[in-house]
């Protein structure tokens, strides 16, 4: 039985990817252990959002490689690099980390990690051959409610990734190039996952994606929303309709919204949060800046006046 150790770096969205990988490893009969020194395979799930996170990821990769070379017992250990850095820079890294890494996998391979590992042990490869790369084009994967997953969070709270990718053209961000265009899960899929988590005893549900406020907009018929389009459930499923459906689920729990984009906030969303008693009166909203000049340079499709007015409307419309 193969033993796998996984190092998860970066944000909560990356953590969910790690949970999905572990779920599929368990399903394949592999054992996941915390101690990399005892593992047959080490997976480093990387982050590359900013330079320091890329440096941290490379540091972990080099550390694992150095440690496995310290003893003969670990010389057959495999090192797999996954996550955002692998997805975006695998071609460059295949050269710079030629001798250190056995395989690079991307965001669409999180459900295929077990057969990839089995394949690494099934074939004889010389060190000179360099790492295998399993990344094919832009990412299109999105999880479903029944996707195998092993939660790494404390028992009382969990993350639910309601969408993947991003359509915003922010000049400082490479996420669209890494994770692709925005693609929402179906509302039914998210609701089913919430129901299952609540039944398992989870008290806090954290909804996450690159832009949670854009949820459902990509599925509107006959409409192509803009980066500044407001949440509007009259056009189809949206974050508002999702929150209302979740609020109807029986149980003692609450929902927290993370990674919202200020450009999509509408009066309907403010009212929905105010009216849904299971939705925490808490908002994670990256304003980034208040200077019009800087916001324009960043392509945030907002302005200082817009942000001030939004905060005023939120304070007035959401008690507490």
Protein language model regions, located:
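Conserved SAM/AdoMet-binding glycine-rich loop
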Residues: 76-83, 88-89, 93, 199-320
């Amino acid at each position: 039985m193969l033993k796998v150790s996984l190092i998860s770096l970066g944000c909560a969205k990356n953590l969910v990817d790690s949970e999905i990988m572990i779920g599929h490893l368990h399903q394949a009969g592999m054992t996941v252990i915390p101690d990399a020194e005892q593992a047959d395979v080490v997976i480093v799930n990387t982050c590359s959002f900013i330079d320091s996170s890329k440096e941290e990821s490379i540091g972990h990769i080099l550390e694992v490689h150095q440690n496995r070379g310290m003893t003969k017992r670990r010389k057959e250990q495999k090192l797999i690099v996954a996550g955002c850095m692998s997805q975006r820079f695998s071609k460059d890294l295949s050269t710079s980390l030629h001798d250190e890494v056995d395989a690079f996998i991307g965001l669409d391979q999180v459900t295929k990690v077990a057969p990839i590992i089995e394949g690494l042990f099934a074939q004889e490869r010389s060190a000179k051959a360099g790492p295998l790369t399993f990344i094919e084009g832009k990412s299109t994967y999105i999880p479903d409610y029944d996707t195998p997953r092993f939660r790494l969070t404390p028992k009382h709270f969990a993350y639910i990734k309601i969408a993947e990718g991003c359509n915003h053209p922010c000049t400082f961000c490479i996420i669209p190039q890494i994770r692709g265009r925005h693609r929402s899960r179906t509302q039914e899929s998210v609701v089913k996952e919430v129901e299952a988590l609540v039944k398992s005893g989870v008290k806090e549900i954290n909804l996450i994606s690159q832009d949670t406020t854009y949820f459902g907009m990509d599925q509107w018929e006959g409409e192509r929303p803009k980066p500044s389009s407001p949440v509007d459930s009259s056009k189809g499923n949206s974050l508002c309709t999702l929150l209302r459906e979740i609020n109807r689920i029986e149980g003692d729990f609450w929902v927290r919204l993370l990674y919202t984009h200020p450009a999509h906030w509408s009066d309907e969303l403010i009212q929905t949060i105010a009216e849904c008693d299971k939705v925490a009166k808490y908002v994670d909203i990256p304003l980034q800046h208040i200077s019009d000049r800087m916001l324009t340079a960043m392509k945030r499709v907002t302005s200082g006046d817009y942000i001030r007015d939004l905060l005023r409307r939120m304070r007035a419309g959401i008690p507490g």
